[in-house]
From Swiss-Prot:
Superkingdom, natural source: Bacteria
Assembly mode: Part of the 50S ribosomal subunit.
Disordered: annotated segments: 128-147
Described function: This protein is one of the early assembly proteins of the 50S ribosomal subunit, although it is not seen to bind rRNA by itself. It is important during the early stages of 50S assembly.
Keyword Ribosomal protein: yes
GO molecular function: mRNA binding; structural constituent of ribosome
Alphabetical UniProt keywords: Ribonucleoprotein, Ribosomal protein
GO cellular component terms attached to this protein's record: cytosolic large ribosomal subunit; ribosome
Name assigned to this protein: Large ribosomal subunit protein uL13
GO biological process, one term: negative regulation of translation
Pfam families for the chain: Ribosomal_L13 (PF00572)
Entries under SUPFAM superfamilies matching the protein: Ribosomal protein L13
Protein family (similarity comment): Belongs to the universal ribosomal protein uL13 family.
Length: 147
């Protein structure tokens, strides 16, 4: 019997919705990255995008443990000399919580074209409403929440 290698046409994608309220950011990011990569499926292969779509709601209510909210920094670089910019996570979460969640998940995906393709299946929203009701997303429960 030959080893099965999934083809992009063989993959059936589902939609999952994750409520980020009172969930630790790192735990949320690892769960979402695993679903985006398709590691929860028996046909997982690292060289094929077998992942599902992920909708994250209540991104503004995500929790950071310890003093990370005030001490952890988010960095970006413009590409020019001296172009390193940094912002504290509490400022980033207040100004643009969707970007903070996307940045955490993006760091857990492959750093190549396949990772960018996986990241395009991630949808993050600030409130508890999302425009993807027609796709009939299944709720995905993260059992361990912040204390």
């Amino acid at each position: 019997m030959r080893t099965y290698s999934p083809k992009p046409g063989d993959v059936t994608r589902q939609w999952h919705v994750i409520d980020a309220q009172d969930v630790v950011l790192g735990r949320l990011a690892t769960t979402a990255a695993s679903i985006l990569r398709g590691k929860h499926k028996p046909i997982y292969a690292p060289h094929v995008d077998t992942g599902d779509f992920v909708i994250i709601i209540n991104a503004d209510k995500v929790h950071l443990s310890g003093n990370k909210r005030t001490q952890k920094m988010a960095y970006r670089h413009s590409g020019y000399p001296g172009g390193l910019r940094s912002v504290r996570y509490d400022e980033l979460l207040d100004k643009n919580p969707e970007k903070a969640v996307e940045k955490a998940i993006k760091g857990m995906l492959p750093k190549n074209s396949l990772g960018r393709q996986m990241l395009s299946k991630l949808k993050v929203y600030k409130g508890d409403q999302h425009p993807h009701g027609a796709q009939q997303p299944q709720p995905f429960e993260i059992t361990q929440v912040a204390q």
